[in-house]
């Protein structure tokens, strides 16, 4: 019974292996093993549908690579991916980068600014962006009208601007019977303006005669548009010389004046061909505003009087278009109004102004000039003018219309003033140009743009142009100053007076410093568009060594007139001898192309003043004189007030003291300044003596009458800096920046030529006292002092013969001639003179001038020409004007081709074009005249149109420009755009290359990494980076990858290529165990075990033996009822303590108790038994096994159940190996 119960007890064994847990297996939706998914090209968003093995593309597009990523983020694509068909802008909106349809690579295209629509009247310009149209409307006669508005151009005329802009729609108001003529039409006879015509002429406000218009009897006062009341003739005063002007002690600036004097309107008196009587002129007066005396809003207008022209039509024209006469902010000199009974003004091209100050009988100080002249504004009486050829023409007693002026300015009576043309009938371009020049001049004079005076008559265009050009000039000026400061090593600090933030001094100084540093390091000068304008351009200019230049205003050629002006025969006759070609013959001439005849032939063309005009010149007279019929000479003005009478009634003042450069005439005469006396320029009466003086820039000559130019450059009275050289002109000078560097031993003269320095004269040599200095070109030489014999002199280190006959050191008597010899001379008797010669007192034969000694050597029509010993009679040649010469037959005058004969004065780099009687100098394409209009300078197109000519970098070249691209780009065929270079085609990368916009990126295949040079790929040692992670046994690195290896015996590589699988030699039959042995597989090997049952036991299974019989109870209790064999495999280094075997009865009953004992194999104490509870025990490892080792343990378990004891034996074979998969 006990045996049966014991036989029914089963042992439950458990192996504790915490190191190898069993993972839970997840069941997929679908088995996708071996499925191949297609490559999704240009896909930026994927999606995997339920049940599918491959993802599908939801959105195609372009991936932003490199620096493009930041542009994409700025453009709104935060993930760095641009959907197909969408784009973004970079470089301040000048370049559009887009992703093509279907995705791929991003391409960028430079965009030029679109043209504004023609009906745009207001452009909105955003910083670093293209201009956009802010408002549409209509432009009529230079004025802008908003769309949808209706305006009244006259009392009987209204015009409407359509909603879409375009042309004004005008109509006559019903019930109105006024003149319907277009009062807004421009003056068809408006003269051409030359912005660079720096001529010797007086200011327009002082050089033009007051123009008078006939007023018919019965007229009811002046037109309403002109203002003012009625003024009796007795209230009209005459001021012979303008009150606000200084005494005329200065001549006109004959040289190139300042840019403010670059524009002067010329007023010419045009006559109809069929009218022989002279024009009548009108003076219109508008009262000055309170608080600003002397400032009016109009200039005199001209209206020729024709028969049958009614007064009502003239008044209607004046009422309909008062704007025609307005010139905003005209900086001119006010004219005075004539007194009753005063002599009429002359009919010359210049005002008959007297160099005397105005007097007023009602003033306490009759000689003190008024700082702010006042005008009478009562309406004039009606008067009729009847010109007569025998008597001077009477001028109606009308008040003049005085233009605006600035009384505090010091105005030269003969200087060229800038009169901006505010004629609203002109084109918008002309208005912008003239107002822009006024804004630049305000910046030059005041160095600020906040206090520009505003005039109600000015249009918005003029105000905007003035302010923008003023600010632009100050910015360019401060930028140039910053560049110069950087080059001179100054600290780049902000300007203290920059309260408006328009100064670019610090920015340009800093940016120039960057360019200078790059240049000092010897690096190449490359543009960096990211610096922006103007920093990038200034940096590049300083790096390349270019000088900054404020580019003069670029002017377009004038459009030809609709029809040539008709000139009367009388006027043509007075001009024929002076003109070098009419303006009608120069339709293609540019401003500044005119040859200044007054400067070419000073003092030869006119008696007093020479005024240059486009293609010709004209003569004018000093105050108190009028031009005669020949157009050259001047005669005293019979109608002008006498100077002596005006001065006799006025006490002396300090201003009438004699200037230091005046010389009194030796013989004083009463009334000596009548008709300007003997003086060439200015005559003054001091006591009873006529004193002649000169204008500034001139000095009185020894004769006390004439004036000669003072060379300020030689006298050292100029104010040119050390960076400039002085160029003298008639009466003035100007400074020019140095652009020519002379070699050592040479110096730059006033003509900008390098001339030799005479070191011997300037004491710059190093010769000793015993040596003689001899100057050589660019240097000098020192020679030892020599002693020459009599008759010789030391010259250039050598003794040369002295010509006593030439030096006059001979002693030959009368009748003898001196003959020079080497070192001496001799006297030779003279011979008798032949016919035609006469012996002088010294015995020489001199020629007899028969042309002067004979009474009539030649008959009429021939000229006497003296010859040596005789004379000849020659027919008088044909007298031709300048620019013409007689032909070979002497029958007619033909044009001189100055361009072919080389007598022109065109500068280097200019083109000469022959004209009838003259020639013209033009600049080559890409060049323009400088601010003085004398030389051609290169146009820096890159500064004129920054950021619009080239996509990347604009480089200025002489006469043109060229575009260049940044690294990674090539210039396109159009020479402006830049195309990306595909660097991958040149195989710059060792493995994979990806081209990106403006650059490229090298990539490496899997298993390689990019080296520091960015081009080479090096192998990645995966085994060193992932030690112990990649492979379970050993990792072997190979090029581009790695391989896992297993021990040479006992293992094989698994399908994953990383893990090693133990070879079961027992299952494979590769063991060498005998038939009596049992093969047991262990990690990497096997063991041959022999399971034999002892006597009295029978084998019930391969590993179990049971006892058969038992002789007595004691034997049954001591001998095991069953012997079981167990094989256990463990890895060395197992953490201790570790339960390796659990034993107990199965099934267990209440009251069961067990005990465990290791009876064999634990001599070293590696193992220990322990009871977990009454019926369960474990075998534990208490010492760590560090080396491979085999143990054979006998573990005996005794079971107490219901008072009996049963023994069980467990034979355990424990194997510790070094590696386990």
Swiss-Prot record:
Residues 1111-1221 are annotated as: Domain III. Induction: Glucocorticoids suppressed mRNA expression and protein synthesis. One of its GO terms (biological process) is positive regulation of cell-substrate adhesion. It is found in: Secreted, Extracellular space, Extracellular matrix. Residues 270-283 have a biased composition (Acidic residues). Disulfide bonds join 435-462, 436-469, 449-470, 479-508, 492-509, 511-535, 512-542, 525-543, 598-610, 606-619, 621-634, 673-683, 679-692, 694-707, 713-726, 720-735, 742-754, 805-818, 812-827, 833-845, 899-912, 906-921, 923-936, 942-954, 950-963, 965-978, 984-993, 989-1002, 1004-1017, 1023-1035, 1031-1044, 1046-1060, 1066-1079, 1073-1088, 1093-1105. Glycans are attached at residues 179, 497, 737, 1072. Residues 594-635, 669-708, 709-755, 756-800, 801-846, 847-894, 895-937, 938-979, 980-1018, 1019-1061, 1062-1106 form the EGF-like domain. The keyword Phosphoprotein does not apply. Residues 248-329, 341-399, 633-661 are annotated as: Disordered. One of its GO terms (molecular function) is calcium ion binding. Component of both basement membranes and other connective tissues. Residues 435-477, 478-510, 511-543 form the Anaphylatoxin-like domain. InterPro entries: Anaphylatoxin/fibulin, cEGF, ECM_structural_protein, EGF-like_Ca-bd_dom, EGF-like_dom, EGF-type_Asp/Asn_hydroxyl_site, EGF_Ca-bd_CS, FIBL-2_dom. A motif (Cell attachment site) lies at residues 421-423. Pfam families: ANATO, cEGF, EGF_CA, FIBL-2, Fibulin_C, FXa_inhibition. Residues 27-434 are annotated as: N. Residues 312-322 have a biased composition (Basic and acidic residues). Residues 177-434 are annotated as: Subdomain NB (Cys-free). Keywords: Calcium, Disulfide bond, EGF-like domain, Extracellular matrix, Glycoprotein, Repeat, Secreted, Signal. Its binding to fibronectin and some other ligands is calcium dependent. May act as an adapter that mediates the interaction between FBN1 and ELN. Homotrimer; disulfide-linked. Interacts with LAMA2. Interacts with FBN1 (via N-terminal domain). Forms a ternary complex with ELN and FBN1. Belongs to the fibulin family. PANTHER family: EGF-LIKE DOMAIN-CONTAINING PROTEIN (PTHR24034:SF209). This is Fibulin-2. It comes from Mus musculus.
